[in-house]
Amino acid sequence: MSPPQRTPGAGPPPAAEPAVIDPRRVAAVVPAFNESGKIGDVVRKVPRRYAACVIVVDDCSSDDTSDEARAAGAERVVRHPVNRGVGAGIRTGLMTAKREGYEFAAILSGDDQHEPDELPRVLTPLFRDEADLVQGSRWLPGGAAPGIPSDRRWLTRIYPLLFRLASGYPSTDGTNGFRAFRLSMLDDPRIRLDQDWLDRYELEPYLLYQAVRCGYRVREVPVTVRYHARGTTKMHWFRDAWRLLRPLVYLRLGIQR
């Protein structure tokens, strides 16, 4: 069966109607690497009235990320025996959610950049059957990016233009990790998250690109992304910028599927 026709462009912010969201159908997936001091806050902030299960995937941290997540009340903590990358962490979390019978997954950053109280923004279009994948955008009206460094602002503004050139979809924020989607999409043989080349930053743009390419209904909604003064980014700009671009190049040219 072909997926429903996607809705191009970004619609207006959905009304936050918690009553429409059944948390028993939702898992929040949180990839984390050396996030001690932050991961506990993330877990505690996830309202269980929107997501019944928080799945933290610890990508072989050298600190006490796993213990802190458990102490904060994470329903599932999965630890990789070796460091594999954020994409592998997301994949593990999604597969765990799917295996446990959840219908929807919301992905949140483990470094406390996202606002879990905004989960209704990414979940409501799914429960209303208006979208199959809902992408958060800090650049839509109603979104925000307080404290964003100038280099990150530049990257997150240029990338959507390249995504649009490659896919035809008018994305405004394809690098934002706050999103939610139907886990049934992973049953589509055209969406192959189990490829090793997606282990790091490639997986998220791959998923978005393939959702568009395969005709799923993709929608953007405004969200907040906060940049904290403490800590340093784990991104290495030139290398990881290529990792974000690689799925667009490989899929557009047919090098990968």
Question: What feature does the model see in each segment?
Answer:
Residues A32, V57-D59, H80:
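Conserved sequence signature across two-component system core domains
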Residues E35-K38, S61, E115:
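Donor nucleotide-sugar binding loop of glycosyltransferases
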Residues G11-E17, N34-R48:
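Short, well-formed alpha-helical segments that are part of the catalytic scaffolds
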Residues R24-V30, I39, K45-V46, C53-V57:
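Hydrophobic targeting segments
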Residues D58-S66:
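A conserved acidic beta->alpha catalytic loop
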Residues R76, H80-V82, V86-R99, F104, ...:
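Acceptor/aglycone-binding surface of glycosyltransferases and processive sugar-polymer synthases
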Residues M1-P23, G168, R192-R257:
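Hydrophobic helical membrane-anchoring modules
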